Curated annotation (Swiss-Prot):
Disulfide bonds: none
UniProt lineage: Eukaryota, Viridiplantae, Streptophyta, Embryophyta, Tracheophyta
Name the UniProt record assigns to this protein: Cicerin
Ranges where the record places region Disordered: 1-20
GO biological process: defense response to fungus; killing of cells of another organism
Function of the protein: Has antifungal activity against B.cinerea, F.oxysporum and M.arachidicola. Inhibits cell-free translation in rabbit reticulocyte lysate system.
This protein's record includes keyword Hydrolase: no
Originating species: Cicer arietinum (Chickpea)
Length: 20
C-alpha cells in the first residue's frame, strides 16, 4: 500500500499494490 494505493488496501484487496 502506497500513498494513493493505501485506499485500495483497506477497501479491497491490494490489486494496485504493484502499480503505484
Amino acid at each position: 500500500a502506497r500513498c494513493e494505493n493505501f485506499a485500495d488496501s483497506y477497501r479491497q484487496p491490494p490489486i494496485s499494490s504493484s502499480q503505484t
